[in-house]
Swiss-Prot record:
<keyword id="KW-0408">Iron</keyword>
<dbReference type="Pfam" id="PF01265">
    <property type="entry name" value="Cyto_heme_lyase"/>
</dbReference>
<keyword id="KW-0496">Mitochondrion</keyword>
<feature type="region of interest" description="Disordered">
    <location>
        <begin position="1"/>
        <end position="46"/>
    </location>
</feature>
<keyword id="KW-0472">Membrane</keyword>
<dbReference type="GO" id="GO:1903607">
    <property type="term" value="P:cytochrome c biosynthetic process"/>
</dbReference>
<keyword id="KW-0349">Heme</keyword>
<dbReference type="GO" id="GO:0005739">
    <property type="term" value="C:mitochondrion"/>
</dbReference>
<dbReference type="GO" id="GO:0005743">
    <property type="term" value="C:mitochondrial inner membrane"/>
</dbReference>
<comment type="similarity">
    <text>Belongs to the cytochrome c-type heme lyase family.</text>
</comment>
<keyword id="KW-0999">Mitochondrion inner membrane</keyword>
<keyword id="KW-0456">Lyase</keyword>
<protein>
    <recommendedName>
        <fullName>Putative holocytochrome-c1 synthase</fullName>
        <ecNumber>4.4.1.17</ecNumber>
    </recommendedName>
</protein>
<dbReference type="InterPro" id="IPR000511">
    <property type="entry name" value="Holocyt_c/c1_synthase"/>
</dbReference>
<comment type="function">
    <text>Lyase that catalyzes the covalent linking of the heme group to the cytochrome C1 apoprotein to produce the mature functional cytochrome.</text>
</comment>
<keyword id="KW-0479">Metal-binding</keyword>
<dbReference type="GO" id="GO:0004408">
    <property type="term" value="F:holocytochrome-c synthase activity"/>
</dbReference>
Amino acid sequence: MQPEQLNQEEESKCPVPPEVRDAWLKSHGGKKPSEVHDTPHPTMLPTEREISTIPKVVTESDSGKEEKWIYPSQQMFFDAMKRKNWNPHPEDMKTIVPIHNAVNERAWQDILQWEQGWGSEKCGGPKLERFDGNVKKLTPKARILNLLGYNKPFDRHDWLVNRCGRKVAYVIDFYNGPTVNGTPSIYLDVRPKLSVHGAWMRVYRWTNEHFSQNSK
């Protein structure tokens, strides 16, 4: 999800596990990958891209460009998955891409809640500077929860947010949520990355929520 041509790594960050994708497709009348024959290249899919609500840090080289992150098109998503040898199918893209976009929008809304009260309104609000996928690297919290018997997240992202010039790191764990009426869901655990400032943000939020509940 970038305002210019996506590189291969950034194109392929889709926080949707195969089992969630398959169940979602089934609930929406789609076919499982095993039921669809391989489609030879080239595959023509929609190239339209959706503009996100996520503000982008604008640099001098970006002057005049869109100041919001832009999601990949169905064609870009398919090509990226093909390069990763994930055996994608064109029919899946119309479902996978909206899920990908919706999950990222939800993650940003959660970050905005964390950012409340930290002064970013004086410069127009926080902006997303960059993001990275770390699917193979468990966060300390996810590791502890797994030791206690909980499932591991199926993906992890690290987002770097610019708050009026201050870099604030966030971590996002993606979990399979419960299936409701045959439709699977995804649970996001969004929080500041563990650091001195991140720990202070967590304490600040917990304190506010605690006293807010007690005052009711």
